[in-house]
């Protein structure tokens, strides 16, 4: 199977690109959705979070307590990622099995380390991304700035870069061009 990861910073347009690729008939999987539907409520993950952070309440991960812990101990983010990423990737590969080509929308491309894949980076200027996040999530400028600061990772090396600061029609043309360069259409 050929796996192509779609990544980019918050508000960059990853979901828009992924939705368009799906509309073209390709298998597209959202790693956040996999985490939220398959991983976060699994007994082994809950036990691991309790062991690592002690942030389980009434048999579920207490997201607020976990966020507070990570805010106070940012070095523990790596432990959280080590607990979550292998589980998400296993579910992704299970779901994608049987497809010749599969796209995966990922927040953290490092989660796919050790798995052969291509990387498509969706970009947009910070001001454009902030507007999108505000419209989508109803967040204040201060909240958005804090979220951007937490996720201010360097842009990964990408096989394809798609600038989404354009009209919907132009973005579709850019994605089609990327699909052609990848010899998928």
Regions of interest found by a model, annotated:
Residues 6:
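Hydrophobic anchor at the beta1->P-loop junction of P-loop NTPases
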Residues 15:
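Walker A/P-loop
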Residues 33-100:
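ATP-dependent small-molecule kinase phosphotransfer cores
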């Amino acid at each position: 199977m050929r796996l192509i990861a779609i990544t980019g910073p918050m508000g960059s347009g990853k979901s828009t690109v992924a939705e368009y690729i799906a509309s073209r008939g390709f298998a597209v999987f959202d790693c956040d959705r996999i985490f939220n539907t398959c991983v976060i409520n699994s007994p082994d993950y809950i036990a691991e979070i309790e062991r690592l952070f002690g942030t389980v309440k009434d048999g579920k991960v207490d997201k607020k307590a976990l966020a507070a812990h990570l805010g106070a101990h940012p070095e523990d983010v790596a432990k959280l990622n080590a607990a979550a990423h292998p589980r998400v990737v296993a579910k992704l590969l299970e779901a994608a099995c049987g497809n010749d080509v599969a796209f995966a929308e990922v927040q953290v491309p490092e989660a796919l380390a050790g798995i052969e894949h291509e990387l498509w980076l969706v970009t947009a200027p910070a001001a454009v991304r902030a507007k999108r996040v505000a419209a989508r999530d109803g967040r204040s400028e201060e909240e958005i700035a804090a979220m951007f600061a937490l996720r201010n990772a360097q842009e990964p090396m990408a096989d394809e870069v798609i600038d989404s600061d354009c009209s919907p029609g132009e973005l579709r043309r850019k994605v089609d061009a990327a699909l052609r360069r990848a010899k998928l259409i």
